[in-house]
Amino acid sequence: MISIAFKHYGFYSPSSNEILETIQMVRMEHLDIRTVTMGISLRDCSHPDPEVFNENIYEKITSRAKELIRTTNEIQSLYGIPIINRRISVTPISIAAESCRSQDFVSVAKTMDEAAKEAGVDFIGGFSALVHKGETRGDLKLINSIPEALASTEKVCSSVNVATTKAGINMDAVGLMGKVIKKTAELTAERDGIGCAKLVVFANAPEDNPFMAGAFHGIGEPECVINVGVSGPGAVNTAVCELENPNLTEISETIKKTAFKITRMGEMVGKEVSRRLGVEFGILDLSLAPTPAIGDSVAAILEAMGLERCGTHGTTAALALLNDAVKKGGAMASSSVGGLSGAFIPVSEDAGMIEAVKAGSLTLEKLEAMTSVCSVGLDMIAVPGDTSAATLSAIIADEMAVGVINKKTTAVRIIPAPGKAVGDSVEFGGLLGSAPIMPVSSFSSETFVNRGGRIPAPIQSLTN
């Protein structure tokens, strides 16, 4: 069936060995489609009456996504390729709900939650604001409502873009987001601050990202679109481990070939979902997204290259090799590569990262260095519950600077776990996994953060 599908979409005809390798990846090496995400524009739903607006977005989401679950289940059964999550992303709510009152934004989040449940999807993203150069009244109303919105919903995810290479870093927004994260943790304290696992702060956020918590349907996107995220750390790790005393060039070539196969499979699934739903196919996100399962780990790939433990000296170089090889292999396989496309390093979602933190080899500072060469940023990191809002903002500012200067996407998804200290851990379950509490600096950044203003765009932003 995989061979037939490849021919159907005009791909090269794979050999019998390649087909068997793909089947092996699915059955034994945790290869799957991590997410099929439907992006839906809500721009035509805007209305000053909150009741009408909520009715509009509920109707739009549920009508557009009504066949998503059935269709993906059929394709999963047809091809034998697991599809782990079905998700929805929508137009940033701060734009669609600009005319709503402050007290209306939580009701919008609840409506999104109800629509996601009706559609049967796992998450819905887009409770978002883009404030890299300043905030509108709608942006501020949304940002201030995030803690209550995430505490009172199950499936809603939120993101805020506070920096771009072209605009610089909005430090007023960075300072505000530290407080929002603290408040979100407090309102979900009984669940180890899980609300913060559904909130991400971005620099250079992509408009077509299929992964949560950062997915939103950008204003340059079509009416409705299908974006797909693949997953394959286990397959890449197995391929590297099977090499006999390779040099790093040989490791890179092997990763490229594996990424090529993973990408072909993902594009095949995405295009078939789009065809059956009558919706435009958008992008394929190449990101290697780990899970807490043993063997499905980005850290394990780095250790297979020769590192005793992820986080030791050489880790950043190994991650750069991995990220580059994944992109090269994926770009050869598809003309629809987009989103984040690289390697994720979420601590709580990667068994190898968790062990590295526990062993003391992986620190917050080393993770920050690693984010300069990989797909996203400081992801799913748990810190002590008494971490100040200013310290959280300073961590965000550092990560935004990495993204702005290097002209890449970076992000922070951090959990100040209420009542927890270094040595403790938090348990979220499922794909979110668990995380040991990591220490932060005991020195204050408060005066710096409170200065506010905007860190200007770097000289490399002048590209015209």
From Swiss-Prot:
Q: Which PANTHER family match?
A: UPF0210 PROTEIN MJ1665, UPF0210 PROTEIN SPR0218
Q: Per the record, a Pfam family?
A: DUF711
Taken from the UniProt record, the cysteine pairs bridged by disulfide bonds within this chain are: none
The UniProt family comment states:
Belongs to the UPF0210 family.
State the protein's name.
UPF0210 protein MA_1691
